[in-house]
């Protein structure tokens, strides 16, 4: 066994830095939290090369006295606690006195600081040692510049991720802190280009607009509650506005962003069954509590805390969100009758296929969902089964029905002056069948026998084969057909674009904007072309024809889900997007004719999996002749 010896101060500083400073975002977090503890109302963060080359944090806080600068860079030196009793009632973001010492141990640090009506001071530190000091002109506040992070511990660099990912982690830190301090003005810049700015006017909804985008903030509602120990306030998204991960839930405890599984579950419980499976809300919740009830000294990053009365707090959060949703539901219940009348109108519609036919040519079969607006197109059955298989010309019948909303997307055919709303029945004629079947697995498809259409009950089709009865969920079946068509279109790399008469401008939060930029090539493979258009915005001038008529809403949801997909093969990503659009475009029962029901059954047999939709839900159930006989006790 080697001889035990005491480690050098330089080495111990580097070890300590490893616990606190994991990446550039850790530096930003520690320095900005110091600024907030100093009472700053304006904080500016600039970085270069994802923070590895340089990070600058400047504030208008109280500053550091001249004779305390050296002490500030000493390990376990702090102004925030004085004795062991203070450790159990921490009211500041920092308290260990490790941040500046840890940062200076693995970088070159320059600090310029001044207190009220005092001469400023400039000091330099490198590798944990002081290199120089001089007077400097400075306003009240502190400016810290960190250069060449990990210059003396190069092994740490190999554990960092891509520059884009490191930038997004910095952005996420500032986002969370700005949500906790809406009265503080934050500015974040990358190589001189402003990525993010808040006004600091104290309006949380305005800060949410800065972080997530105005379109998100407009769909969020406030909530609040309190008891003898806790006071909670915040903003919550409506149930229809969700994300595919929990990353958009921000819990701020006395201004500190924390991660807490129990409180996350309390938020989800507040929404109850109003959220779709694997969908999560956007929530910003601020919790005010006596510091005596919180132990923040349980994790190096201080993002995990130990809470007294956690169960009581969880119940308070759940009830507050549930009550807020109940209030909104009662206010909107008056719209239910209008929706029922609209559905009745659609159900009573008799499809007249003898009207004049409007011809248009598309390479991609389009999508139909149950008419949310009662004006749509119905595809006419092909009259000539001997038409060439490589043709993709579709015939449509235009049925005009009074509509509630005159706002819809105009489809522009460049060689004809024809305006059509893009909604049609998702049933392939025989020409398109050849495209669908080419993507399927013949072995699997042939396992489904040829079924004869019998009739329908509500949303279910009835079919039979050799005395066996089959119940087919028409919604799931249509989604499977739609998925096959969309997936084949995307993977064919021959995606037809439809021009927009009026381009769509999509505004995103700063983090989403960076993520989209990072995946712009993969998004183009979907046929979605985005061009930067101002700060945190993209412009869309055309869209792929496999998207149905709610173009902006559809693209937003596709991008949101696409961003949150786990990394994997591009084909798997294509399947997820195709499944999403199939689910969006087919949302309810429609009044099917016998011919249309027969066509669904015929097409279903040609798909890659006729038994499940793209989300794995069951499409059909078989009841054998023997089972039917047993039900009626035949043969006994």
From Swiss-Prot:
Q: Does the keyword Transcription apply?
A: no
Please name the GO terms of the biological process aspect recorded for this protein, alphabetically.
Answer: mismatch repair
The record's listing under Gene3D superfamilies reads: 3.30.230.10, Histidine kinase-like ATPase, C-terminal domain (3.30.565.10), MutL, C-terminal domain, dimerisation subdomain (3.30.1540.20), MutL, C-terminal domain, regulatory subdomain (3.30.1370.100)
Q: Which domain of life is it from?
A: Bacteria
| Keyword annotations from UniProtKB, A to Z | DNA damage, DNA repair
Any one GO MF term held by the record is:
ATP-dependent DNA damage sensor activity
What GO cellular component is one of the record's annotations? Answer: mismatch repair complex
In terms of Pfam families, this protein maps to:
DNA_mis_repair, HATPase_c_3, MutL_C
InterPro entries referenced in this protein's UniProt entry, alphabetically: DNA_mismatch_repair_CS, DNA_mismatch_repair_MutL, DNA_mismatch_S5_2-like, HATPase_C_sf, MutL/Mlh/PMS, MutL/Mlh/Pms-like, MutL_C, MutL_C_dimsub
Instruction: Give residue spans, biased composition: Basic and acidic residues.
Output: 363-393
Known CDD domains for this protein?
A: HATPase_MutL-MLH-PMS-like, MutL_Trans
Region Disordered, annotated ranges: 362-393
- What protein family is recorded? Belongs to the DNA mismatch repair MutL/HexB family.
Q: What does this protein do, in the record's words?
A: This protein is involved in the repair of mismatches in DNA. It is required for dam-dependent methyl-directed DNA mismatch repair. May act as a 'molecular matchmaker', a protein that promotes the formation of a stable complex between two or more DNA-binding proteins in an ATP-dependent manner without itself being part of a final effector complex.
- Identification of the protein by name: DNA mismatch repair protein MutL
Name of the gene encoding the protein in the UniProt record: mutL
């Amino acid at each position: 066994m080697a001889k035990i010896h005491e480690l050098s101060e330089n080495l111990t500083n580097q070890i300590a830095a490893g616990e606190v400073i994991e990446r550039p975002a850790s530096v930003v977090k520690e320095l900005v939290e110091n600024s907030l503890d100093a009472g700053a109302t304006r904080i500016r963060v600039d970085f270069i090369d994802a923070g590895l080359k340089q990070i600058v944090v400047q504030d208008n806080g109280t500053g550091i006295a001249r004779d305390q600068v050296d002490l500030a860079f000493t390990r376990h030196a702090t102004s925030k606690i004085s004795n062991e009793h203070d450790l159990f009632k921490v009211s500041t973001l920092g308290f260990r006195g490790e941040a500046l010492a840890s940062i200076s141990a693995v970088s070159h640090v320059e600090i310029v600081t001044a207190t009220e009506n005092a001469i400023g001071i400039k000091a330099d530190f490198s590798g944990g040692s002081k290199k120089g000091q001089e007077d400097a002109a400075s306003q009240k506040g502190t400016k810290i510049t960190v250069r060449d992070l990990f210059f003396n511990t190069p092994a740490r660099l190999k554990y960092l991720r891509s520059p884009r990912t490191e930038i997004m982690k910095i952005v996420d830190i500032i986002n969370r802190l700005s949500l906790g301090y809406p009265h503080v003005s934050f500015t974040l810049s990358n190589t001189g280009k402003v990525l993010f700015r808040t006004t600091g006017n104290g309006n949380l909804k305005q800060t949410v607009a800065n972080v997530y985008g105005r379109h998100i903030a407009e769909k969020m509602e406030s909530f609040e509650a309190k008891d003898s120990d806790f006071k909670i306030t915040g903003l919550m998204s409506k149930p229809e506005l969700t994300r595919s991960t929990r990353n958009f839930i921000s819990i701020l405890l006395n201004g500190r962003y924390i991660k807490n599984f129990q409180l996350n579950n309390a938020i989800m419980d507040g929404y109850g069954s109003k959220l779709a499976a694997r969908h999560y809300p956007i929530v910003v919740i601020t919790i005010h509590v006596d510091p005596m009830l919180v132990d923040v000294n349980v994790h190096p990053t201080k993002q995990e805390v130990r809470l007294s009365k956690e169960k009581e707090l969880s119940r308070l959060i759940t009830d507050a969100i549930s009550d807020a949703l109940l209030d909104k539901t009662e206010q909107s219940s008056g719209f239910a009758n209008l929706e029922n009348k609209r559905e009745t109108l659609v159900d009573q519609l008799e499809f007249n296929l003898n009207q004049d036919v409007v011809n248009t040519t598309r390479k991609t079969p389009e999508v139909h969902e149950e008419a949310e607006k009662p004006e749509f197109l119905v595809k006419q059955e092909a009259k000539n089964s001997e038409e060439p298989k490589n043709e993709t010309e579709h015939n449509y019948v235009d049925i005009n029905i009074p509509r509630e909303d005159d706002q819809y997307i105009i489809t522009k055919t460049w060689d004809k002056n024809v305006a059509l709303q893009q909604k049609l029945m998702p049933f392939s004629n025989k020409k398109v069948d050849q495209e669908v079947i080419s993507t399927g697995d013949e072995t699997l498809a042939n396992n489904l026998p040829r079924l004869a259409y019998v009739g329908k009950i509500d949303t279910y089709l009835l079919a039979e084969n050799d005395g066996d009865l089959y119940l087919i969920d028409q919604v799931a079946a249509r989604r499977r057909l739609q998925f096959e068509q969309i997936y084949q279109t995307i993977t064919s790399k021959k995606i037809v674009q439809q021009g927009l008469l009026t381009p769509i401008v999509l505004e995103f939060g700063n983090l989403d904007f960076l993520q989209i930029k990072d995946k712009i090539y993969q998004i183009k493979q979907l046929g979605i072309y985005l061009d930067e258009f101002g700060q945190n915005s993209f412009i869309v001038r055309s869209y792929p024809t496999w998207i149905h008529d709610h173009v902006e809403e559809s693209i937003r949801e596709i991008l949101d889900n696409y961003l949150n997909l786990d990394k994997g093969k591009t084909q798997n990503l294509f399947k997820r997007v195709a499944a999403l659009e199939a689910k969006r475009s087919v949302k309810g029962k429609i009044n099917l004719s016998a011919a249309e029901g027969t066509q669904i059954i015929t097409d279903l047999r040609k798909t890659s999996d006729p038994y499940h939709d793209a989300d794995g839900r069951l499409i059909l159930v078989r009841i054998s002749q023997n089972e039917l006989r047993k039900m009626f006790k035949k043969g006994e």
